[in-house]
């Protein structure tokens, strides 16, 4: 039996990979591998995500032997533990590979892939949850989606509930069951991941990036206006405090607020530009902008505080 396991382990050793053949989308030059997760075009400087499965000596084929037949699931967990000196590490790598596979499918569907750091932290947190709760297959994807979204918010990366559900290929956009489980474990101090983080910062960062306004930000500073992100955040927090617009989608409110602030800072940005670059419907952002018209008297003092155009209506 030991000899058979050794032969199986030899077969599981990774073969030498072929040289990377990816080419740059912009200049069609050969891209250079700079890490396990990124390629670099030395001609134009473009970075591209790239996924290479990590090999772990403990994560071998014999560690994944499965029992078949009657009552197989009852004994499978014991077999896994018996064949692995580090069961927790085995589970981590198994979940990480599953997340990487989902990330590739997510990218193939036209979505922006999540950074490898998000995937690793999601796998680690899922491992923590497994130590305290038996996870049935019916809720596994909901829990992974809930963890993924919470990790993104912690790292200030935009991720809506719909994004997380789409990533894990759930049939429904709801992940409330997974969120409730994580929340109960957090309250009991069994996990350190807080699922109730405010998503505002992550949406501000993603909108800031989508509008490509790094240079705009510098110009606003030259005009002695406060940091753009902080201004947008202060408007949203003030609206929440006054219970204004709380029934609107958070991402929509952030996009509308940033557009409103930029316009009032005399920057010539058109709503059609925001619609295109942020991938949002025009009537959706228009409804959110109406919040600032209907409650103008509440926001006037903030306009003046940040030296913005305080007129009730902008031309």
Curated annotation (Swiss-Prot):
Q: Which family does it belong to?
A: Belongs to the asfivirus C315R family.
Superkingdom field: Viruses
Name of the protein this chain belongs to: Initiation factor TFIIB homolog
What this protein is reported to do is described as: Putative initation factor.
């Amino acid at each position: 039996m030991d000899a058979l396991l050794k032969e199986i382990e030899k077969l599981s050793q990774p073969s030498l990979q072929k040289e990377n053949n990816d080419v740059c989308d912009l200049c069609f030059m050969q891209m250079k591998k700079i890490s396990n997760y990124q390629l670099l075009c030395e001609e134009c400087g473009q970075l591209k995500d790239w996924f290479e499965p990590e090999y772990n000596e403990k994560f071998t084929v014999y560690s994944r032997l499965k029992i078949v037949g009657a009552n197989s699931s009852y004994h499978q967990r014991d077999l896994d533990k018996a064949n692995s000196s580090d069961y927790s590490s085995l589970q981590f790598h198994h979940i990480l590979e599953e997340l990487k596979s989902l990330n590739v499918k997510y990218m193939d569907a036209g979505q922006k892939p999540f950074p490898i750091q998000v995937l690793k932290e999601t796998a680690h947190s899922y491992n923590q949850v497994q130590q305290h709760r038996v996870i049935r297959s019916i809720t596994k994807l909901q829990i992974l989606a809930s963890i993924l979204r919470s990790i993104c918010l912690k790292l200030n990366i935009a991720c809506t509930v719909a994004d997380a559900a789409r990533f894990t290929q759930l049939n429904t956009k709801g992940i409330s069951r997974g969120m409730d489980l994580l929340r109960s474990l957090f309250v009991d101090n069994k996990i350190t991941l807080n699922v109730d983080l405010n998503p505002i910062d992550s949406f501000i960062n993603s909108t800031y990036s989508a509008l490509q306004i790094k240079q705009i930000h510098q110009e606003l500073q030259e005009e002695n206006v406060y940091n753009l992100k902080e201004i947008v955040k202060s408007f949203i927090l003030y609206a929440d405090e006054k219970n204004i617009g709380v029934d609107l989608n958070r991402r929509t409110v952030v996009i509308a607020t940033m557009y409103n602030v930029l316009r009032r800072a005399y920057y010539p940005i058109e709503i059609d530009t925001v619609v295109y670059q942020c991938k949002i419907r025009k009537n959706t952002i228009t409804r959110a902008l109406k919040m600032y018209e209907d409650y103008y008297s509440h926001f006037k003092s903030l306009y003046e505080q940040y030296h913005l155009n305080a007129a009730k209506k902008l031309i």
